[in-house]
Regions:
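C-terminal flanking tails of non-heme Fe-dependent oxygenases
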Residues: 2-160, 164-166, 175-176, 181-385
């Protein structure tokens, strides 16, 4: 990619549909006429991104300095999560407030060793900066492959190419063999996955309690929130003209929960509605050292019956970099999960509320998410009652 020390992966992608993840939801209000071109990221392929709207587009603006002074992404200290009922009750309340109002929060003192976090980021950077010939064997758009690498996963649906290369590792419930994982990532990927699964278990316990349910509810078979895990490494080269492209277009996540590790470059933004003028603005999510960023996905918003929020977010291109991040998606996986029915949870704190969504199988949800393409609406709108 341009701006990095490696050569671009100049391959012609096939048109096989990527079954996971489905295309991200993005705004269709300002579609450029430029047709995206695969892989090559020189300035001639860049188009004015649909995710940088004018002031007239949905009245969304970048957060101004005084707005940022009034708002920050919640940071939750998980120290003491396993000790004492009073501290745990405080943590449940903090998580509940974050997912109800913002949909995003960061966690510190989460128990994942700093060495594991830094080694995972370094491994992904090393892989992406290998010669194209070394990366070529992993190039795939086959959603059934447990290891795949490419640029622009929604290339044939998006109105503009994005400035990013991605390595997908589907690690659970059945992960790839060590030989399938690129050598640069092979040693650390399994250890990192194990740590993230443990952290995910803690988070789903807190979220279950935030719904007024027993702490194992979201992990149990009926919900299955912890069964599937995709570890997705993104590499964003420095862009010579960052105003002409996006690192990742605005979208929501087709997951139960996303746990993100990012380096210090920054660029992640979340769309948040400030109280004062009731207008949504893009707010920076800082690259807090040693922290994971956590956000609610569409599946969990449906299960929670709108008590938890899945919100739009994006990544800006930067003139510095590369930016490296690891997004860990807890999501449905496999044939058994495809037949599972997703429906609002109407027990616990939600017992008195009518359902806000129709029931649907996981397969129906994923197919709709993929087939609806980038029409500027949320997947959940189709199922809302």
């Amino acid at each position: 990619p341009a701006g990095s020390s490696c050569s671009p992966l100049l391959l012609t992608p096939s048109r096989s549909s990527l079954q996971w993840p489905p295309p991200a939801v993005a705004s269709a209000t300002s579609r450029p006429s430029t047709t995206p071109r695969p892989a090559s990221k020189d300035s001639s392929t860049q188009a004015s991104p649909p995710s940088r709207p004018s002031s007239a587009t949905r009245r969304i603006t970048l957060a101004r300095a005084h707005d940022e002074d009034r708002f920050a992404i919640p940071v939750i200290d998980l120290a003491g999560v396993t000790t004492g009922s009073s501290r745990r009750a405080e943590l449940v309340a903090e998580v509940k407030a974050a997912v109800k109002t913002v949909g995003f929060f960061q966690v510190v003192n989460h128990g994942v060793p700093g060495t594991v976090m830094s080694e995972m980021l370094a491994a992904l950077r090393s892989f992406n900066e290998e010669p194209a010939e070394a990366r070529r064997p992993y190039y795939s758009r086959d959603g059934q492959s447990r290891v795949r690498y490419h640029s622009n996963f929604d290339l044939f649906r998006s109105p503009a190419a994005i400035w990013r290369d991605t390595l997908y590792l589907d690690m659970a419930p059945t992960g790839p063999s060590p030989e399938e994982i690129p050598p640069a990532c092979r040693g650390i990927a399994v250890e990192f996955t194990r740590e993230v699964q443990r952290l995910g278990g803690t988070l789903f316990e807190l979220l279950s309690e935030a719904l007024g349910l027993h702490r194992g509810f979201l992990e149990q078979r009926e919900a299955g929130c912890l069964e599937g895990l995709s570890v997705v490494g993104h590499y964003y080269p420095a862009s010579p003209q960052p105003q002409l492209t996006m690192g990742t277009s605005r979208h929501t996540d087709p997951s139960f929960l996303t746990v993100l590790l990012q380096d210090s470059v920054g660029g992640l933004q979340v769309l948040h509605r400030l109280r004062r003028d009731d207008q949504p603005v893009w707010v920076d999510v800082p690259a807090e050292p040693g922290a994971f960023t956590v956000n609610v996905g569409d599946f969990l918003q449906l299960l929670s019956n709108d008590r938890f929020r899945s919100v739009e977010h994006r990544v800006l291109s930067k003139s510095v970099g590369p930016r490296v991040s690891v997004a860990c998606f807890f999501r449905p996986h496999g044939a058994a999960a495809a037949a599972r029915v997703c429906a609002p949870i109407l027990v616990g704190d939600g017992a008195a509320s009518p359902p806000r969504y129709r029931s649907a199988t996981v397969e129906d949800l994923i197919v709709h998410y993929r087939d609806k393409a980038l029409d500027g609406t949320s997947m959940l709108d189709h199922y809302r009652i």
